[in-house]
Amino acid sequence: VEKSPAAISVAESEQIPKEISYKMISYNHHSMRGNLQEKKNTILKLAELLEAKRTELAKVDSKFCSDIFYLFNNLNIRHNNVDPSISGKFKQAVADMPPEKLEHWYDETYQMCLLAFLRLEQADRKMEFDKLKSVIESN
């Protein structure tokens, strides 16, 4: 099981349903190496969760939000980007990408998902901090 503090923090947060928590923690386990389908499935579940928070994430960092959703939509995660018969979705570079390189980009996308959830959590924390600061400064 992965020992990434970020993965554990996000997996244990209220933002993540229990059925997805274990998948997040085990994502970087050695047994997952080369398992593109399982990695894709985990990222897809995270993408679904982030879709519901997309507006909020865009307020935190619109460029980051744009980048992560670009990866979801163009790396054969949410859409079939490798079948040339699917007009408008096919991406030659993705279709030609060696599995090792695609796995690298899946791993980067996973890391960006962790960061997205942490940034959303920090946005909530910042609101609470601002309230505390206001109380402290008003005395």
Q: Which positions does each model-derived feature cover?
A:
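Helix-loop junctions and short alpha-helical segments
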Residues: V1-S21
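A generic structural signal for ordered alpha-helices
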Residues: P5, I20, Y27-N28, K91
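Generic alpha-helical structural element
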Residues: S9-I16, N35-E38, P98, L102
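A mid-sequence, solvent-exposed acidic-amphipathic segment
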Residues: S21-K45, L50-T55
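Alpha-helical oligomerization segments
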Residues: L44, T55-N139
